[in-house]
Amino acid sequence: MQVIETLADGLKRELKIVIPAADMKARLDERLVDAKDKVRINGFRPGKVPMGHLKKMYGKSIMADLVNELVREKPSEILSSRGEKSATQPAISMTEDEQEAEKILSAESDFEFTVAYEIIPAIELKANDGIKVTREVVEVSEDEINEQILKIAESARTYETKKGKAADGDRVTMNYLGKVDGVAFDGGTAEDAELVLGSGRFIPGFEDQLVGVKAGDEKTITVTFPADYPAANLAGKDATFDVTVKEVAAAAAVEINDELAEKLGLESAEKLKEIVKGQIESQFGNVTRQKVKRQILDQLDEMYKFDTPAGLVDAEFDNIWRQINTDLAQSGKTFADEDTTEEEAREEYRKLAERRVRLGLVLSEIGEKAGVEVTEEEMQRALFQQLQQFPGQQKEILDFFRNTPGASASLRAPIFEEKVIDKLLTEISVTDKTVSKEELLADDGEEETETKKKAPAKKKAAAKADDAAEGEEAAPKKKAPAKKKATEADAE
């Protein structure tokens, strides 16, 4: 077998693989000998079929299998012997000439094929002790704990029927029928709907007009759907709702005591506070980690500059661009609304894709050199978390991860990345800084990359993809589930 390098340009490589016809014939004869004792042909006893007859009947199909095996197996063997790793699946090309293909299948001509690929660049790791990060720490106050407990308590708050007029904080139970231009619309009708006045769950103006109603009242409410309302047929439209009030109920007082804790399944208020404090600390800790991770990645980005495989960048850009267009479609906005053009957006996100690929390669190299491994237990836990996100679709999800090439890598990658970050945190300089909750949660423009400073609106569009790869926080984006009732869709 000959391996001839026909292209070496930057990260691009192209190899011509030549397997002599004599070698192909020897491989074919070996397979025919093996098949001789297995095939059953009328007129011949087992194992007594002449080789010539066997070759005539099965030679080409066996040779076709051999060709497929060689194309499937040889590229990885050759790259390994060259000390190279392909960034993406190598592209294989063979002759398209039918006569030449016939000669190859008959072992009359050398079998040649071409392997084109991009190599993963060699990365010379640098010392990590020059990386310095600030870890923001929030001390959880008693007020913060009590505030969170009150929110929990309010979600389980009880209500008692009242005879008077409804006020802010009261719960109104009602039937309603919504109309636009006098015609009822889908999602605008409900019976026994419960609404706490002042909660902001319904579209603007709806709740305000219920203040002062009593049980048994009938009232027509007039509102205007927001211009950015998710349902295009209702956006900006005036609507009326014929409301029948069935009950007005006042909220029972909420106190943080043992009785409340018992309602929540705990033995005491102290235990409740302990659990809530732990939850808050965990939430703050997650934000802190993301901000620290961002600092680490930004510094690694400055430390390592090298060409990235175009195939990986293209794939990463496609993922980001798909997310952007999905978000724009859901919001009904255009690039002009985001104060940019499609061309500018493509340029900015191409830079982001290159950064993400470069950092991914650096983290991978750091992890491999440090012996970072993802355990089977960690993979199973990640898979279980995926299954929990799609109730009722467990079988489909399992089949996807079992049968889709590369699917398991999507589970492994984030685990591996976090373990590499953990490793780096033991080697770099970390300075703790006590801050307030507001300071921790505030967007820090100075920590944004230059790419994102130029396009703050676009950052939101790809926030989900960006956070997953780089741990960079972005402002949460309000979205309304498509199936939510029309009166509620704009509120949560």
From Swiss-Prot:
Catalytic reaction annotation: [protein]-peptidylproline (omega=180) = [protein]-peptidylproline (omega=0)
GO terms of molecular function: peptidyl-prolyl cis-trans isomerase activity; protein folding chaperone; ribosome binding
Location of the PPIase FKBP-type domain: 169-254
Keyword Acetylation belongs to the record: no
Localization terms from the record: Cytoplasm
Keywords assigned: Cell cycle, Cell division, Chaperone, Cytoplasm, Isomerase, Rotamase
Family: Belongs to the FKBP-type PPIase family. Tig subfamily.
Name of the protein: Trigger factor
Source species of the chain: Agrobacterium fabrum (strain C58 / ATCC 33970) (Agrobacterium tumefaciens (strain C58))
Gene name in the database record: tig
